[in-house]
Amino acid sequence: MKKTAKDAISQLFKDKDLNLHFGDSEVFTYSRIPFGIPSLDKLTNGGIPKKKLTLIYGPTNVGKSYLASQVIANVQNSGGKAAWIDTELSWDAEWFSKCNVDVPKTIVAQPNNAEQSFDTIRKLMQAGVDVIVLDSIAGLVPETVAEEEFSYNPMAWQARFVNSSLPKLLPNLQYGSAFIAINQVRASMGPTALDNMPGGLAQTFFAHFLLQVRRSGWIDEGEGKNKEKVGFNMEVRLRKTKVGGENWKSVTVPFRVEGGIDIVESYIREAIERKIIIQTGAWYNYKDDKVMGLNGVKQLFLENDELFNSLKNELTT
């Protein structure tokens, strides 16, 4: 009986259409693409996973696209290929250059409709592009809707498209791409005014990583009349994971309007949390140095590359 079962299983494995593998097969292994921000890489267990779908969602203007751009920048730094599917027609080469993205080497598509968007993504996956960003699900318009009059508005047209098309797209992740989909949060109609995402529930069902982004406070500089908002604290929460990471935990990183995420301050905050930098009131101690105020600590590391590299090594080893 055992021999019969063994023979039957062996025969099944010869049928390539069944796509059978043992659980420890290399087919199921995947690498990660880091954000390059210590607290975020810790939260996500090393970054965005390849061969998986990551959904980044939140209100408008909280840094969702910026986070995706940092993944692209890190892929390009290691010689990989990246693509941006721009359904919102918002691609700005100057802004992405400021985000350290190698713009001339980035594939940018602005499809005419939702079907064309998904077909482009499928072909890019099959071509082995390392990371593909869809910005955004909210901008997907099916061809049947796009070709009609503006008054044509069938019920749940966007959700129906995403629910039926996303499962067809995901098998192509086997070619090795990291697929990042960005979506907006909108207030639903009704007395409860709950936040929801356009595109239906399939996106959250099939996502391997679900990152929620929101603004948790402003960063001000100056005093009195000269005080102005220069950025905000970006809170990133891992709402769901099928691939490790600190599920349901969140991190807060400083985002400056002119320069994106403040990497130096991000390292400092992580070091304070891990007690590598000791804070006593307004004073901060690191090794033999003692300075006053967070800006003082930042200045210390900005003026001393060797000291900053020492801090980075402590946080990454």
Indicate where each model-derived feature is located:
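C-terminal regions of RecA-like/P-loop NTPase motor modules
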Residues: 1-27, 218-317
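Catalytic phosphate/metal-binding cores of nucleic-acid and nucleotide-processing enzymes, i.e., regions
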Residues: 54, 77, 176, 294-302
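Conserved inter-motif catalytic segment of the P-loop NTP-binding fold
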Residues: 59, 70-71, 75-168
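The Walker A/P-loop phosphate-binding site
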Residues: 2-106, 122-123
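Residue-level signature of catalytic and energy-coupling elements of molecular machines
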Residues: 40, 55, 96, 135, ...
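Conserved NTP-handling cores and scaffolds of large molecular machines
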Residues: 16, 60, 75, 79, ...
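Phosphate-binding/switch region of NTP-binding enzymes
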Residues: 155-274
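Generic beta-sheet signal
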Residues: 54, 130-134, 177-179
